[in-house]
Amino acid sequence: MSKPILGITMGDPFGNGPEITVRALNDKTVYDRCRPLVVGDMTSMAYALKVAKKVLGIDLTLNPVKDVKDAKFTYGTIDVLDMGLVPADKIPDTSDLDEPKPFGVGACALGGEASFQYVKKVIELAMAGEVDATCTNALSKEAINMAGHHYSGHTEIYADYTHTDKYTMMLAHEDLRVVHVSTHVSLREACDRVKKARVLECIRIANEGCKAIGIKEPKIGVAGLNPHCGENGMFGTEEIEEIQPAIDAALAEGINIPEKKPTPPDTVFSKALGGWYDIVVVMYHDQGHIPLKVKGFVYNKQEKHWEAVAGVNVTLGLPIIRASVDHGTGFGHAGSGHANELSLVNAMDYGIRLAENRKA
């Protein structure tokens, strides 16, 4: 089996994506498993490489290409499909200092337009079969909206440009995986979205998503919405009126839900970590994100930076493969050469595994 081609978006040019990408592609084992192609800008990647060489001693070269077939896919050379969207004079250059400083640009229309176009391009490549999987670095939701692209994140862009109606986000770190009934909406709206049809569809997608990464007989946990799953309607009726009927329908389809009922949100993740579930269906964004980030993120208060930023975001239900970092743009530190690449490494691993399983 040939190694899969991974299309990796650079992310916001003023965020941590370029330097994270350089760090991740400094690992030879990446090239042993896949053929990575960065979709972004040579100007940003060149600056990230210059800073990485100064801060970490990384010694790589860049190969600008206009087509996938022009890529070398050789360790030591990063192939960049150069979109030519970021002028060099827009990148604050402090690489001559002993300690390069963060860009300090933050969210802006230029960064939003560029990062949106990288995503659009990598989707086109995947839909055309020119790349086998896509991996995305962080973009700024504020920036892409400043540029006139009114989406709430990567997931919605992918759904729109692949014409997908039924999809959901899966977050994963090691043996903890979650999928969401709703994501980028207010908490008030998230409660309104807990409906039987949505919950059932997420259970189905979670089941298929686990199978796609090689779990043959997934065990699925379904979190309740309310404290103690509502205590038989005392603290809310969503569990009785919406979640339980969805579980009953899923069980009738042969999907394995060991509890056969919703599990209280404050215990469901401990059970998942103990191996009782392979994946948990959660009712809203933070219900799933908080446990994943408690497990995968480590903050060093002395150094005032993240020592570990682990985890991956996979969009399930798409006709193409998309895995992403599970963190933001890091505008406050981006450009200084101290970003952590672990989440991108995780995303690339998932992209490779999903591509291999799809080909098998």
Regions of interest found by a model, annotated:
Residues 1-154, 199-221, 225-283, 287-312, ...:
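Contiguous, glycine/small-aliphatic-enriched amphipathic segments in soluble metabolic enzymes
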Residues 181, 316:
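Substrate-binding rim/cap in mid-to-C-terminal beta-strand-loop elements of soluble/periplasmic
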Residues 171, 313-315:
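Well-ordered beta-strand positions
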Residues 149-177, 183-186:
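Flexible loop/hinge segments that line or gate small-molecule binding clefts
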Residues 156-165, 187-211:
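Active-site glycine-rich loop that binds ribose-phosphate moieties when present
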